């Protein structure tokens, strides 16, 4: 838990504080809403057609630190993955900007922690309402920078906004305890207090929702944040900063430092090793998560991490084929297969295998349409970059070379270098890359199995365990398998399981902690035991 000390000004607006441990000078008027200068027109000239006509206030290109929009010494380009067109040039923050953002967040924390839960709740609710009022523009930003189909982008904005709504309500439900001790003259109190400044590092596949799921909980708890968005999708984070400012979130409470891939490593290390940071929250690859854990270890920071997955999708003989296919379509091809909870391997019992594969292939051909995310009817957009396409292509070629059969798809799409055909493979075996390497693309490999025990063994062989799915009509089997799968989340006869009300997270090397739900706010709170004697 952070203790606040006086820091020399880093140029950020400071907040007053009544917290006795914080020796920052109070400001007249109390909390100071973030200022909102207009964006520089020179930075906006490069936007492609997907962003044309959007509110200039939402199309930000500078960092947002201490309530101010600040340029960096350099900029980096952000591209539309569908067309390759330049969307704009964004501030390329470095270590200096990262440290300034942490200082701004630390100074703001000393007052934000003292704001009443009711007021924090009200501000988060205003932020939520502004997201809803601007949902169409926010969705277009997501589609432009990530390639996600516009319909899915609209869904993400609602999902993202709902986290702010949820945590605006949870802010008022942070309760402590009173414990009666064996000694009659004592009472024991358990207090919950905000942990401090949180470093928040988010991925490109859900550039809005992965921010609000973390930041909503942090701000509700009384923490402040420094957000480092993915270099592919910084515009969503910056648009959220503008709306946070409009909502009256005080200066320094929400800070955003975009940076290029070249600077990402040093910026991430700077914010994660800074002694003023008390918490790290990260969503991304297991490899990067392990690096951040090393950074956290030196100063024993609190961490929560949602890392890679290898989600099994099991279809037992008793399953309803149509339901299983519908679930497979939803769990595999959302965001073109680029989610951490996408089904990565399909385990189908021998008795139902042929019927499932046939129906799955038919559903893919009938319902999946590859195209630009802005085109009506598109269900499968581009992958985020050509490196992602190469990974899918490598897995397909490896599987075919080892005996797998391509049922449909199997190659790059004619639309462009970042597009790949939705692909279904059968005759897949466990020695193939696609069964033990997270795909993050539109590839569905099917493994035939004989017994329940065999399916469980295959599913649990992975060293990660984020999500798992299975279809069965046998009640006893449902209980057995749900309890035996080594994952943090299980979908039983359901392919879409994410909800703001439910805890999201994994086991094994899929991460630490939970996000969303009533448990999410606890990731940003410390327990303090107070023994009150002499009664």
Swiss-Prot record:
PROSITE patterns referenced in this protein's UniProt entry, alphabetically: ALDEHYDE_DEHYDR_CYS, ALDEHYDE_DEHYDR_GLU
Regulation acting on activity, per entry: Redox-regulated. Inhibited under oxydizing conditions.
Modified residue annotations for Phosphoserine: 499
GO terms of molecular function: identical protein binding; succinate-semialdehyde dehydrogenase (NAD+) activity
Modified residues (N6-acetyllysine): 126, 265, 365, 411
One Gene Ontology cellular component annotation held by this UniProt entry: mitochondrion
Pfam families referenced in this protein's UniProt entry, alphabetically: Aldedh
Keywords: Acetylation, Disulfide bond, Mitochondrion, NAD, Oxidoreductase, Phosphoprotein, Transit peptide
Oligomer status and interactors: Homotetramer.
The protein, known as: Succinate-semialdehyde dehydrogenase, mitochondrial
Native organism: Pongo pygmaeus (Bornean orangutan)
């Amino acid at each position: 838990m952070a203790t606040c000390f006086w820091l020399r000004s880093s140029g950020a607006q400071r907040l007053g504080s009544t917290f006795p441990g914080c020796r920052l000078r109070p400001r007249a008027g109390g909390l100071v809403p973030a200022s909102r200068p207009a964006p520089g027109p020179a930075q906006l000239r490069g936007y492609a057609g997907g962003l044309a006509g959007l509110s200039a206030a939402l199309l930000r290109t500078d960092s947002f630190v201490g309530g101010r929009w600040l340029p960096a010494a350099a900029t980096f380009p952000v591209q539309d993955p569908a067309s390759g067109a330049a969307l704009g040039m964004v501030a390329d923050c470095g270590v200096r900007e990262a440290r300034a953002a942490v200082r701004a967040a630390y100074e703001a924390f000393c007052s934000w922690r003292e704001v009443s839960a009711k007021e924090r709740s009200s501000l988060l609710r205003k932020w939520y309402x502004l997201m809803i009022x601007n949902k169409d523009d926010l969705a277009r930003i997501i589609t432009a920078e990530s390639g996600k189909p516009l319909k899915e982008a609209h869904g993400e904005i609602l999902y993202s906004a709902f986290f702010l709504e949820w945590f605006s309500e949870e802010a008022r439900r942070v309760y402590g305890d009173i414990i009666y001790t064996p000694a009659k003259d004592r009472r024991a109190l358990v207090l919950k207090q905000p942990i401090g400044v949180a470093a928040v590092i988010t991925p490109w596949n859900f550039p809005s929702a992965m921010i609000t799921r973390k930041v909503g909980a942090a701000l509700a708890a009384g923490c402040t944040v420094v957000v480092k968005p993915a270099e592919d999708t910084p515009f969503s984070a910056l648009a959220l900063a503008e709306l946070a400012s409009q909502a009256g979130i005080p200066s320094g409470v929400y800070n955003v430092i975009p940076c290029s891939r070249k600077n990402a490593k040093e910026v991430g290390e700077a914010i994660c090793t800074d002694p003023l940071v008390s918490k790290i929250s990260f969503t991304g690859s297991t490899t990067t998560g392990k690096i951040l854990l090393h950074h956290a270890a030196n100063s024993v920071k609190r961490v929560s991490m949602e890392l890679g997955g290898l989600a099994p999708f099991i279809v037992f003989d008793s399953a309803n084929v149509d339901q299983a296919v519908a679930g497979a379509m939803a769990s595999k091809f959302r965001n073109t297969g680029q989610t951490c909870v996408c089904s990565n391997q399909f385990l189908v019992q021998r008795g139902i295998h042929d019927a499932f594969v046939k129906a799955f292939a038919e559903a893919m051909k009938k319902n999946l349409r590859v195209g630009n995310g802005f085109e009506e009817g598109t269900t499968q957009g581009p992958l985020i970059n050509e490196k992602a396409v190469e990974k899918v292509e490598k897995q397909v070629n490896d599987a075919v070379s080892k005996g797998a059969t391509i049922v449909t798809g199997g190659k790059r799409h004619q639309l462009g270098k970042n597009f790949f055909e939705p692909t279904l493979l059968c005759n897949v075996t466990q020695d193939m890359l696609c069964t033990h390497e997270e795909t993050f693309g539109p590839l569905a490999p099917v493994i035939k199995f004989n017994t329940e025990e065999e399916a469980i063994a295959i599913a649990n062989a992975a060293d990660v365990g984020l999500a798992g799915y299975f279809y069965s009509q046998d009640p006893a089997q449902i209980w057995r398998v749900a309890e035996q799968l080594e994952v943090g989340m299980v979908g039983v006869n359901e392919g879409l399981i994410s909800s703001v009300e439910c805890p999201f997270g994994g086991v094994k090397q899929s991460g630490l902690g939970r996000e969303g739900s009533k448990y999410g706010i606890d990731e940003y709170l410390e327990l303090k035991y107070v023994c009150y004697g002499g009664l």
